[in-house]
Amino acid sequence: MRYARRLVAGTLAAGALALSLTGCGESVDPIERLGRKATQEPSQTPSASASATAPAPDSAGAQGGASDEAYKKWGLTAPVQYAPKPAQKPQIPKAAPGKVPVIDRIPLPAEEKIVFLTFDDGAEKDPEFLKMAADLKLPISMFLTDSVASSDYGHFEKLRDNGSASTVNNHTLTHPNLRTLSFEAQKKEICGQQDKLEKRFGQRPPLFRPPFGNYNDDTLRAASECGVSSVLLWRVSMQINNFQYAQGSALQPGDIILAHFRGPSELKGATEIQMTTRMLQRIQEQGYRIGRLEDYL
């Protein structure tokens, strides 16, 4: 239970720290940079068997790791280590009636050095990143914003379907600061993207991440009414070269890592692949394995 209490306390702190973790240092928010770009409606529809959550990987998939040589191809000096699906899921505190729980770290014992990868927005659509993610079998929880991702939802469908059990989740229609909106306006942003993602990917996403990490009680009520099961925040954000921490100066068991689908224009010339390689190196340097977030919820 002490892990559950720690999670609740951490959630309160993360709300105040979230904006600084996305908007300072080497990072530039791609939504703010791109503005309200016109995007085309996705023309494809999901197949009868498609779903927003790909089938869980077998022992050769994300939880068993990539091929022995794949890591060298992408600039790593050792294979990425993956955590198996837990025999029993951690205890997550329940939300008040009519709301959804807010999670910023998975409550794990100190000896379970496991972290989780999440990528936001969808501005960058680098085909080489698709190859990297498939080769390494990275289990990525995607949080997509329609205003930048919808110009090529097919890119993220390929990422979901690459055998790593990556998932598609909700990051609003237009990436607003939800605290500034009424309940009805928040519900439109959240439910609207739920509807679009369900239509395009075949399943209503269970997870929602508020832009900038900003939310209030209306957000939690709106998310519940839109069919969301949990609001996901984070404790660590990947910048261009290094992590930025909400607490301390190192990864902690259960940390949810925030990264973005970004390219050279947002990363000061670095590519999405270079940023991801550095992120994986930092995880390895601290002796952590990567888990599939949804397996722990």
Mark where each language-model region is.
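Secretory targeting and sorting signals
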Residues: 1-28, 44-46
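Structural recognition of the beta-strand scaffold that forms the well-ordered cores
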Residues: 115-119, 140-144, 167-170, 206-209, ...
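C-terminal domain-boundary segment and adjacent tail
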Residues: 100-109, 270-297
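A short acidic, helix-capping loop that chelates divalent metal ions and anchors anionic groups
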Residues: 175-181, 265-266
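CE4/NodB-like, metal-dependent polysaccharide N-deacetylase domain
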Residues: 134, 139-141, 167, 183-216, ...
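Active-site beta->alpha N-cap acidic-glycine motif
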Residues: 75-177, 196
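N-terminal low-complexity, Pro/Thr-rich disordered segments
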Residues: 24-105
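His/Asp/Glu-enriched short active-site or ligand-binding loop at hydrolase and phosphoryl-transfer sites
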Residues: 214-253, 290-294
